[in-house]
Amino acid sequence: KKNKKVFTHGHFLRPQDVAMLSALGLNKVKVTRKVIVGLLSNGNELINPGKRKEDNKIYDSNRYSLFSLLNSNSIKVLDKGIVKDDYNKIKSQISDLKNNCDLIVISGGASSGSRDFIIKIIKEIGAIKFWKVSIKPGRPFGFGFFNKKKPILILPGNPVACFVIFFLFGEVLLNYIQGNFSYKKSFFIVKSNFSMKKKFGREEFLRGRTFVKNGIMYVNKFYKQGAGILNSLVWSNGLIRLRSNKTIIEKNSDLEFYPYER
């Protein structure tokens, strides 16, 4: 219909949207460029996959999971790799990312001995807005800005916590940067197939897997919920949200479930 709005600002163009634009006779439309995200892992103990494993070393799984999450959001990634616990090297890499990216994502520094380096550097050339949140997993999570408008995420070093925090907050922030201001994480209500107790005043996000029984969708939680247990992410198909005011979860309770796949 004439003068009818087809798409709003910030709409991500899908194949069917391109078909619609073509059917309207449009061969050109104005779009925003891809968001550039700077990625950096920090820690003396980290090595890249494919390298020979040495004592007291761990493979850097965080950067690769973040890279995959970012690619699924049509993001251009500037990967700085692993930066060891050297103040000047860390500052140099962060400064470079600050000048060339729309968003900076750092993993590792938030829960290792090097976190003081990260926080000090950001305070020197930017500002920390908050540090540590009442969420499990993911308490050592920091957020700040450079030049009052360029955000930086400091993610936990534990791989599950890193994934959960970016899944919950990073994707929302990316959509906001892209102009999709109304974006919210999607969830639906499921019935718990388990019971448990939790700490009051803290939100928890359990790794869970849904199933349908007699037309009702239930969810099981992974038997072990540690912040470093990657099996829990592989086994699950989404996150179960336990609100901060809850202390007891009874079987057949209504719970919010955030699927990994949209």
For every predicted segment, state its role:
Residues 1-79, 223, 239, 259:
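Short, glycine/charged-enriched hinge/interface segments at domain edges or termini
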Residues 13, 82-90, 135-140:
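Short acidic loop-to-helix transition motifs that present clustered carboxylates
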